[in-house]
Amino acid sequence: MGEAQLLPEGDVKSRIVKSPIWKRKGDPCIMVIFGGAGDLSKRKLIPALCNLAEQGFLPQPFAIMAVTYSDLTTETFRQQMTEDIKTFALRPVDAAIRQRLVEHTHYVRGDFADPDTYEQLKARLGEVANQENLPANYFYYLAVAPRFFGEIVRRLGAAGLAREENGCWRRVVIEKPFGRDLHSARALNAEIKQVLDEHQIYRIDHYLGKETVQNLLMFRFGNGIFEPIWNRRYIDHVQITAAETVGVEQRGGYYETSGALRDMVPNHLFQLVSLTAMEPPISFDANAVRDEQAKILHAMQALSPEEVLSKTVRGQYDAGVLAGKQVPAYRAEPNVRPDSSTETFAALKLFIDNWRWSGIPFYLRTGKHLARRVTEISIQFRSAPFQLFRSTPVETLRANRLVITIQPEESIALSFGAKVPGPIMQQGTVDMCFNYADYFGSAPSTGYERLLYDCMIGDATLFQRADMVEAGWSVITSVLDVWQALPPRDFPNYAAGTWGPKEAQEMLPGTGREGRAQAA
């Protein structure tokens, strides 16, 4: 048998970077940003485009068309954009790249509800395409309030700007929230599908722009050691946490109509559940992956009204101390009613009714002004049999735990038991940890780079389909109904800077089941 050949240090990284598929540029196109002068565009989208340009993924030629009601011209918008890039880019942007992006940016002023705005946009798109030798490939990013989603799509259709013809494509990117309940989500889907085919609609979830989330597919299906034990025989339970230290800040008006459940669970958290629990797809084709995700969402058991009372917890933060600073209660935030019953914390215990996950609880938790900022997936395995250790000082065997951290630092850690050095048998817990930044280096990212790139190449894998959106809302409909029918009597019920209401921790019964974040 020949000797094993070790790869030279750094060889894996170099092969990943140089692989042709990774260097595929997006299709030449014009990105139309409705709400192009707003915060999302300034802080996330434009910096993400700068990063794509520096990494060599932005198509050439490429142009931006911003559409807003602000009293600006193309020249004044370009000046503002230059300053915004300097302010919000995650690192200094190469001057030549910044200049090229700014020079290929154009501006249309108009009301989103005015048909003349779309005629003006149509004319400008034609001019820019001719001037810059661009095909008529357009993707429209709706960085606007949800009330404009249907209106803008209807107007695009009426102006002939949504129709795909002569080999050119049209795509529409829609931000969350996609509806505020099952009824409104269905209505919005029906409205936009009168204009667009499903393959043209990209319902974006920026959580899926995180490398660790995308790595779930590689981690599960690209390694022979994990998938065989990824089922009810070996896993005790799964905890998915999205904890934020920030409060609602200046978004009190929006949050009053949303709350933590609507804001985070049917989109962000259910996407993480579906990627964690899905069956292997037949390929990495977008619909093959999303078919399996949709099966998980449809298999999630909706809670009965009685189960809502025992398997959900809601909370609202009171005044408290965070990072050594006093912070106000939710009811004292701007644009929040002083008697508000809106929840800023939500926790649920759910089950997936299929062969792989039958009887395994999934604990979901999200909240504002919690003790630590962390988004993670924690898989706790079943404990080993204790018989062998009955005559030793070991009192219990701690369960193995796999923790996939999405933010703030992207990492994967596996904890397992090891003997503590010494003459007697004692168990300690040790960790094997992989940190993305340590191995691959730390590249600046807004979380939108991969998603924008996928829009340009037409890969919808990381975007939700209509059936996925509606399935997510279906699961929480009973929770919304019960919570609305029974206003909370104990709000506020957790201090800012803590881990939320104590009832959330009490949902984790049984030996070894503890709140993952509190234990970390």
What are these regions (language model features)?
Residues 2-174, 178-520:
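Secretory/organelle targeting and membrane-embedding segments
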